């Protein structure tokens, strides 16, 4: 496994991040334990989750599964760089009228305590804002996070799904307080979704943030099975997406065959080739999927292959640099 620094921090993390969103939903607890053991055995020590995972009435279930795995011992917790998120409501009846989306000091304090309890740990390495809060002032948000960092319950703060200007605003407000602020941004990024190249990646590069890519396989479209799936089993939305990108996916599949590599691994290797990217998040449902995916870090894409991929999946922006989006 390869390792890199988490943004501008001195903390090193694996180039693949284990996503756990399926745990307790599509992946049962026993299989989730095996996946986490296998990941750690192969050097993947960067794990990502969120307090909302498990979804609906089961919100928090994924964190609980990870906590049970930590409780098995074997230095599991000590070996993992753990990231979780806050923002969404998790149907806690004690929250009353505050059971809503947001990043108030009240919510961050209460929901961090809930995450720590479910995860059976006393600290989180990377605590992430799952979305931007347009209502709560930055003074309150940063006061909440600073308090948790000073208490030792949180090491670093990250964001997720922020626009480029949100990152700049957040950092400017943190600097006023002489606080480190953000160290990462988690963002949707793949060969099929390159919008982040217009604003988010340039902002992250300038601010010294590591970018963690979610949905690097574009919801499975780049996984190699989309074109082979039974049309009768597809949802209307899925069928429309496949038809929209059919020509691109066919060309991509042909290129991967020439390279002798699986589509999913080439798609991940492309993300890894971007120097702004810390790691793509992989979300295996089975141990077998994880074993296949780990091979992505061994693939090196030369300039010609990167050019060919860019021809198949052109980035955004047109003729003007970064589209002058700001």
Swiss-Prot record:
Any coiled-coil regions, as ranges: 242-305
Membrane-crossing segments per the record: none
Annotated InterPro entries: AKR_Detox_Biosynth, NADP_OxRdtase_dom, NADP_OxRdtase_dom_sf
Keywords: Coiled coil, NADP, Oxidoreductase
Enzyme class, UniProt record, top EC level: oxidoreductase
Keyword flag Glycoprotein: no
Annotated family: Belongs to the aldo/keto reductase family. Aldo/keto reductase 2 subfamily.
Protein name: Uncharacterized oxidoreductase YrpG
Originating organism: Bacillus subtilis (strain 168)
């Amino acid at each position: 496994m390869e390792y890199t620094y988490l943004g501008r921090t001195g903390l090193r993390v694996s180039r693949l991040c284990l996503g756990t969103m399926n745990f307790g939903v599509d992946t049962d607890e026993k299989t989730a334990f095996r996946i986490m053991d296998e990941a750690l055995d192969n050097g993947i020590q960067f794990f990502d989750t969120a307090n909302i995972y498990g979804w609906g009435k089961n919100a928090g279930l994924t964190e609980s599964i990870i906590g049970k795995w930590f409780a098995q011992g074997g230095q599991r917790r000590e070996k993992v760089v753990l990231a979780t998120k806050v923002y969404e409501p998790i149907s806690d009846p004690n929250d009353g009228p505050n059971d809503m989306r947001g990043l108030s000091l009240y919510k961050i304090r209460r929901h961090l305590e809930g995450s720590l309890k479910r995860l059976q740990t006393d600290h989180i390495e990377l605590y992430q804002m799952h979305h931007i809060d347009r209502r709560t002032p930055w003074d309150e948000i940063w006061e909440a996070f600073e308090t948790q960092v000073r208490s030792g319950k949180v090491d670093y703060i990250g964001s997720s799904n922020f626009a480029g200007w949100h990152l700049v605003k957040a950092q400017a407000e943190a600097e006023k307080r002489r606080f480190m602020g953000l160290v990462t941004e988690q963002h949707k990024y793949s060969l099929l979704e390159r919008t982040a190249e217009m604003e988010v990646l340039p902002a992250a590069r300038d601010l010294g943030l590591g970018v963690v890519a979610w949905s690097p396989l574009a919801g499975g479209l780049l996984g190699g099975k989309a074109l082979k799936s039974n049309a009768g089993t597809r949802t209307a939305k899925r069928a429309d997406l496949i038809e929209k990108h059919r020509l691109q996916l066919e060309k991509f599949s042909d290129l991967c065959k020439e390279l002798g590599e699986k589509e999913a691994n080439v798609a991940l290797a492309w993300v890894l080739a971007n120097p702004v990217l810390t790691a793509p998040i992989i979300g295996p449902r089975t141990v077998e999927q994880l074993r296949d995916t780990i091979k992505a870090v061994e693939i090196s894409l030369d300039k010609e292959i990167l050019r060919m991929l860019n021809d198949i999946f052109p980035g955004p922006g047109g003729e003007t640099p970064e589209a002058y989006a700001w």
